[in-house]
Amino acid sequence: MMNAGQPTLAAYLILGAMLFSIGVVGVFLNRKNVIILLMAIELLLLAVNINLVAFSRYLGNLDGQVFVFFILTVAAAEAAIGLAILVAYFRNRHSINVDDIDELRG
């Protein structure tokens, strides 16, 4: 049960939908910078996590909140690996432009 003055499930779902929409717009409109693309993908994952926590709290089940910890762990590893690859790519090519990445050579 939620106390008076606390946000409802709908408020959390609207927040999650807004964050997800911003992330989708960031992925589709950004065609230049890989770092912004990675940030938009992380925003998508954050929106999903907010929805999982909201439903978990609403239903009184902790499974969604525990699952969020696993998602955050995978997202942190993905971001670390992505940034490491990006740093190595920048050292070789001196660019982080998305258009330049499609040409990989051995």
From Swiss-Prot:
Q: Which GO terms describe its molecular function?
A: NADH:ubiquinone reductase (non-electrogenic) activity; quinone binding
Function noted in UniProt:
NDH-1 shuttles electrons from NADH, via FMN and iron-sulfur (Fe-S) centers, to quinones in the respiratory chain. The immediate electron acceptor for the enzyme in this species is believed to be ubiquinone. Couples the redox reaction to proton translocation (for every two electrons transferred, four hydrogen ions are translocated across the cytoplasmic membrane), and thus conserves the redox energy in a proton gradient.
Topology in membrane: Multi-pass membrane protein
What biological process terms from GO does the record include? ATP synthesis coupled electron transport
Xref: Pfam families: Oxidored_q2
Q: Which UniProt keywords apply?
A: Cell inner membrane, Cell membrane, Membrane, NAD, Quinone, Translocase, Transmembrane, Transmembrane helix, Transport, Ubiquinone
Question: Domain of life, per the record?
Answer: Bacteria
Q: How does this protein assemble?
A: NDH-1 is composed of 14 different subunits. Subunits NuoA, H, J, K, L, M, N constitute the membrane sector of the complex.
TM region positions: 9-29, 35-55, 66-86
* Gene Ontology cellular component annotations, sorted alphabetically: NADH dehydrogenase complex; plasma membrane
The EC number(s) given in the record are 7.1.1.-
Compartments it resides in: Cell inner membrane
Mind telling me what this protein is named? Answer: NADH-quinone oxidoreductase subunit K
Output the lineage of the source organism.
Bacteria, Pseudomonadati, Pseudomonadota, Acidithiobacillia, Acidithiobacillales
Q: Does the keyword Translocase apply?
A: yes
> What chemistry does it catalyse, as a reaction equation?
a quinone + NADH + 5 H(+)(in) = a quinol + NAD(+) + 4 H(+)(out)
User: Into which family does the record put it?
Assistant: Belongs to the complex I subunit 4L family.
Q: Which organism is it from?
A: Acidithiobacillus ferrooxidans (strain ATCC 53993 / BNL-5-31) (Leptospirillum ferrooxidans (ATCC 53993))
Entry annotated with the keyword Mitochondrion: no
What Gene3D superfamilies does this protein's entry cite? 1.10.287.3510
